[in-house]
Amino acid sequence: MKRVVIAGTSSMVGKTTISTGIMKALSKKNNVQPYKIGPDYIDPTYHTEATKNKSRNLDSFFMDEMQVRSIFKRHSKNKDINVIEGVRGLYEGISPYNDVGSTASVSKTLNAPVILLMDARSLTRSAAAIIKGFKSFDTELNIKGVIFNKIRGEGHLNKLKEAVKYYDNDIEIIGAIPRDDGLSVSQRHLGLVPTPENKQKLLERIDLWGNTVEECLDIEKIVELSDESFDFEVDEKNKEETLWKVEKNNSKIAVAFDESFNFYYWDNFDALEENGAKIKFFSPLNDVEVPDCDTIYLGGGYPELFSEKLSNNKSMIDSIRNFDGKIYGECGGLMYLTNSIDGKEMLKLIDADAVMTPNVQGLSYVKGTFEKDCIIGEKSKEFKAHEFHYSKLININENDFSYRINRGKGIINSMDGITSKDGDIVGGYAHQHCIGNPYFAANLSKT
């Protein structure tokens, strides 16, 4: 299984731009399977557009080593090469004392060659020191190459090459990307702008990234390095049941998917389908009513940017308010379930109001415990998730909660998962993953 990790020396060095460009360039001749390390749900949408294969998350906080390998192996079948974008800097994880949640952790678990990506502005000899430090910090890692980003010109690149090769003749210099503001992509408070927004413009940008990578990097060298991968074993007993609970249910789940709601882990959909669910996508922004279903799944996104249009779609609001099945909303979906977002009327199914703030309100890996059986979990079971939001809930009237947050923030007083009296509606800030919460899919797919 050919595989390679594109790892940054830090955040903001151009990982998504260049990783997506590599995926796009390789896809012209190869069937490329993309991955994102960490809990990000926006970057994978860029990978998916570049390769036409759904990008998957690999995360050593949500998953143990065997689960990381199992997820990788099930999606790498019949693929020519697997390209894995890292998270933050190579060694950043949840702790300063170990590599859990880091790019390094997943790279070692997969025995994958690593290509370092470095912002080389104003660097020459220091680049050699950075590479030497990264290689010596953990000798179990297989750091094979380096890409320089934002170089000034050919003279700058030649000095970089001379310095790096003088101190480390084994490192492969894959190439360099010039400084060009035209290669950048718009960002906002939760990260990159998701691909469902202004999709045509973003597709043109991805084409530009792919063409730039072809011109500036040695693509064949990347393929050659990926061919040096060591194989690894996956326990044949480690089937889906050890990734997530599987019950043969028979339900229809309507998933909100449009410009306002698109933060999802695609493996969650696989897990739901393996539990017998039939998934239908719909748009709270543009559709008239929710499709025929047993359960509504409202994922995260940017409902605050589309609050007026959401509020004005009265037929959809009435359709969801009158729905008599189960409804699960997380983060943006939770906001939609409340009385209002910044004063714009919403579903009024959870008695609270969502307001945006200038500062991050929750940004953390999450550990939690279910206080009761609910539509996404089982009493006393623990789960791992992720939260990242600038909104908060106010005017929280008497509400019941289904889970306690032991690491992270939740909605209020370390509680999350506001639950309706009949238990059919749950809304929380934690983004659930089907491996971090192995009961998620089995419970949500029940009729």
Swiss-Prot record:
The keyword Lipoprotein does not apply. Residues 252-439 form the GATase cobBQ-type domain. Its cofactor is Mg(2+). The active site is at C331. The keyword ATP-binding applies. It comes from the Archaea. Its EC number is 6.3.5.11, 6.3.5.12. Coiled coil: none annotated. Disulfide bonds: none annotated. Keywords: ATP-binding, Cobalamin biosynthesis, Glutamine amidotransferase, Ligase, Magnesium, Methanogenesis, Nucleotide-binding. Pathway: Cofactor biosynthesis; adenosylcobalamin biosynthesis; cob(II)yrinate a,c-diamide from sirohydrochlorin (anaerobic route): step 10/10. The a and c carboxylates of cobyrinate and Ni-sirohydrochlorin are activated for nucleophilic attack via formation of a phosphorylated intermediate by ATP. CbiA catalyzes first the amidation of the c-carboxylate, and then that of the a-carboxylate. Catalyzes the ATP-dependent amidation of the two carboxylate groups at positions a and c of cobyrinate, using either L-glutamine or ammonia as the nitrogen source. Involved in the biosynthesis of the unique nickel-containing tetrapyrrole coenzyme F430, the prosthetic group of methyl-coenzyme M reductase (MCR), which plays a key role in methanogenesis and anaerobic methane oxidation. Catalyzes the ATP-dependent amidation of the two carboxylate groups at positions a and c of Ni-sirohydrochlorin, using L-glutamine or ammonia as the nitrogen source. Comprises of two domains. The C-terminal domain contains the binding site for glutamine and catalyzes the hydrolysis of this substrate to glutamate and ammonia. The N-terminal domain is anticipated to bind ATP, and cobyrinate or Ni-sirohydrochlorin, and catalyzes the ultimate synthesis of the diamide product. The ammonia produced via the glutaminase domain is probably translocated to the adjacent domain via a molecular tunnel, where it reacts with an activated intermediate. This is Cobyrinate a,c-diamide synthase. The lineage of its organism: Archaea, Methanobacteriati, Methanobacteriota, Methanomada group, Methanococci.
